[in-house]
């Protein structure tokens, strides 16, 4: 569940309030996964940042406990709210070698007026500060986000503010959504609903920006040695490559005579194999 009541979201009405899984229950599942050979786990939830508020626990403590499970070599976090990213939170995460420096911070808009109508509980300044804290504590972390275009009342000026803000933060990946009404939410009955054709136009602009920033982020790794957890084979131009991900969630492909399912290897990133996959020499 969720306690946030963003004006566009039906989840608090449909799924109720936050209900956290017991720490021991989570640890038991992680241990079962490790015993089955899994090396990476993702801690996720509808509103992950609120973990523990209903039972006297905290997300940081849960992460620290999962970090102690033998056999698990990577811990990836699901979507976070910027308010959880304090100096202490980031410093503690940076001490844990299993943490993947891949942080999905939901933004939704780069305009404070739009954020207020959305009932998001932070400002663009607070969000930017969270990104700065992460970049101070991790080397080239992957910061990804969600953005809604065409929210009721979003003017051309507000959209322009969002676009410039996104350029300044410089994300690895952005999930762009056109606002759609959810019956029963406050936003559904707001005035100044944005026409569909304008939403489509704004979405196209941000998708192009997202592709450009993503290419730039991935290109940073060319020539660098990285560790990849390989997952599965794929065919590219009639050749078989094994693909997997770095800790920053950059997709990598390598040619090899041996199967690499669930194998972790280091290699040097060479160049782009496709628009979204970089090849590696093992």
Provide a role label for each language-model segment.
Residues 1-24:
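Canonical Radical SAM [4Fe-4S] cluster-binding loop centered on the CxxxCxxC motif
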Residues 1-7, 27, 31-35, 39-42, ...:
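N-terminal pre-triad scaffold of radical SAM enzymes
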Residues 26, 59, 127, 159-162, ...:
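Aromatic/hydrophobic pocket-lining residues that form the small-molecule binding cavity
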Residues 35-156, 167-168:
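Conserved SAM/AdoMet-binding glycine-rich loop
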Residues 52-67, 71, 118, 181-212:
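Radical SAM enzyme [4Fe-4S]-AdoMet core and its adjacent flexible, acidic
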Residues 105, 146, 166, 174, ...:
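Hydrophobic, well-ordered secondary-structure elements that form the walls
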Residues 173-180:
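Internal alpha/beta loop-helix hairpins
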Residues 189-282:
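Terminal RNA-binding accessory module
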């Amino acid at each position: 569940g969720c306690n946030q009541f963003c004006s566009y979201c039906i989840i608090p009405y449909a799924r109720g309030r936050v209900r956290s899984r017991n720490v021991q229950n989570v640890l038991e599942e992680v241990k079962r996964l490790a015993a089955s050979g899994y090396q990476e786990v993702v801690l996720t939830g509808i509103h992950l940042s609120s973990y523990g508020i209903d039972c006297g626990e905290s997300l940081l403590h849960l992460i620290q406990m999962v970090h102690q499970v033998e056999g698990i070599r990577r811990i990836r976090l699901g979507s976070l709210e910027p308010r959880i990213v304090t100096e202490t939170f980031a410093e503690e995460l940076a001490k844990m070698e299993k943490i993947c420096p891949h942080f999905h911070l939901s933004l939704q808009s780069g305009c404070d007026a739009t954020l207020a109508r959305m009932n998001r509980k932070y400002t663009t300044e607070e969000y930017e500060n969270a990104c700065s804290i992460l970049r101070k504590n991790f080397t080239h972390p992957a910061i990804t986000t969600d953005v809604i275009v065409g929210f009721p009342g979003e003017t051309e000026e507000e959209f322009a503010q969002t676009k410039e803000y996104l350029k300044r933060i410089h994300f690895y990946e952005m999930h762009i959504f056109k606002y759609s009404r959810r019956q029963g939410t406050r936003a559904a009955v707001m005035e100044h609903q944005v026409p569909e054709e304008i939403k489509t136009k704004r979405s196209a602009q941000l998708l192009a920006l997202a592709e450009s920033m993503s290419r730039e982020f991935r290109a940073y790794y060319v020539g660098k040695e990285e560790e990849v957890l390989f997952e599965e084979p794929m065919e590219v131009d009639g050749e078989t490559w094994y693909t997997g991900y770095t800790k920053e969630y950059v997709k990598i492909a390598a040619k090899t005579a041996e199967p690499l399912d669930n194998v972790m290897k280091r290699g040097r990133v060479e160049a782009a194999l496709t628009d979204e996959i970089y090849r590696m020499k093992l």
